[in-house]
Amino acid sequence: MAESPPTEVPEPPARPVLVVDFGAQYAQLIARRVREARVFSEVIPHTATIEEIKARQPRALVLSGGPSSVYEPGAPQLDPAVFDLGVPVFGICYGFQAMAQALGGTVAHTGTSEYGRTELKVLGGELHSGLPGVQPVWMSHGDAVTAAPDGFEVVASSPGAVVAAFENRARRLAGVQYHPEVMHTPHGQQVLSRFLHDFAGLGADWTAANIAGVLVEQVRAQIGDGHAICGLSGGVDSAVAAALVQRAIGDRLTCVFVDHGLLRAGERAQVQRDFVAATGANLVTVDAADTFLQALAGVTNPEGKRKIIGRQFIRAFEGAVRDVLGDKPVEFLVQGTLYPDVVESGGGSGTANIKSHHNVGGLPGDLKFTLVEPLRLLFKDEVRAVGRELGLPEEIVARQPFPGPGLGIRIVGEVTATRLDTLRRADSIAREELTAAGLDSLIWQCPVVLLGEVRSVGVQGDNRTYGHPIVLRPVTSEDAMTADWTRVPYEVLERISTRITNEVPEVNRVVLDITSKPPGTIEWE
């Protein structure tokens, strides 16, 4: 088995608030909400030992929800030694119950479950001080805390939970049965912020300016006097990563734009124009379309396509180093890997590999560069904020996400030149109509997918047709960890469908994907 490519992962920008994941659907969302309170956070699995937690020097702990019952055999447990660390702790849902149990409280199956919107009655305390006495919250529990631990004040209740929140200000401990991290709990962010800033005493120091400054210094320390090469995909992530590294090492960075033939219409010209104008960076374009298509010939498996694209991508870089940079030593490869990429590729301890990202799990084992991934701890909205802080224009930082493997993973089936041309035309029409309708700010991204191995019968011009379907996948999201389908007006969908079926040969059907994430991922492959 090939060894993993060398990666130097710098120290986190600050001592983190650790979100302990008990199997929650929303663990990443909790981490993001902590960051929205301008406090740095990371997620760790519940299997982390006390020694591992202590080594991270956390500023506070947040215990996530989870699907288990705390009293069932094999359920994730909370080591009571956590409370001997002297750090503030906040429990949410299952984490709230695990906290109560570990501290001597009582958790039971009361026979009264609460799922969805529930009214919370505030009884006092500091956690909900200044907020409405009765407020809507989002619940998801079958068990409940029936008695708080000694020394804790019960500060809220609900119809199904006599102890819906408790706190111990002296020990800087608190918890809630509901989910403050979801948008269905209107005052949830205020409660979480109150714990972080008032209970835990943490400053609001996780800002775009501070993030950019720290990351620039980290890159400078990692690369030293070396030279780096950065791959531009045309997307936000690689552009911000390149701008950060250029700020750190100046003209010792060379940016390479690999045209792998899997780009959308007009994308190559846009990258060459916008990025160079914004940064003045050294940019080399490599035309590798034929090489990529040859490597992808006959491949239909999504994981196989991603790994081939990742491998060919690196080979194109190595060729650029030889042909363009000559004898100048280039040791570092900059990539725009984000926190969700790392999580979905199994890069976080205790996480399952959902799919290989071309810039994480799709890299070859014999990689000849050391990776520099300055954005690997950031969510997308944080990347955009850092990009603005670095002076990148809105044309770059506000772009909708586009995967590095490009249209190669938006063709279900074999990637061919003909299918790419078909998909480009359909994608261009969809983007034109969504922009004309003023929907760009509403939609996180809209993958347009060609079902290359599927045909359906149609009628066009009184003739029977047997063409491919096109799938529209407009989604709304905040960080790509979860997503919902965007309610695009019917008249806009009608225009897109009419134009695609009239203007794109071989397409006779347009369908709309209305699946949320989870269970479906944003991209089809």
Curated annotation (Swiss-Prot):
Gene3D superfamilies per UniProt: 3.30.300.10, 3.40.50.880, HUPs
Q: Can you name a GO cellular component term?
A: cytosol
Which UniProt keyword terms apply here?
Answer: ATP-binding, Glutamine amidotransferase, GMP biosynthesis, Ligase, Nucleotide-binding, Purine biosynthesis
Pathway the protein takes part in: Purine metabolism; GMP biosynthesis; GMP from XMP (L-Gln route): step 1/1
PROSITE patterns cross-referenced by the UniProt entry: GATASE_TYPE_1, GMPS_ATP_PPASE
> Matching CDD domains, A to Z?
GATase1_GMP_Synthase (cd01742), GMP_synthase_C (cd01997)
Q: What is this protein called?
A: GMP synthase [glutamine-hydrolyzing]
Organism taxonomic ancestry: Bacteria, Bacillati, Actinomycetota, Actinomycetes, Mycobacteriales
Q: Which gene encodes it?
A: guaA
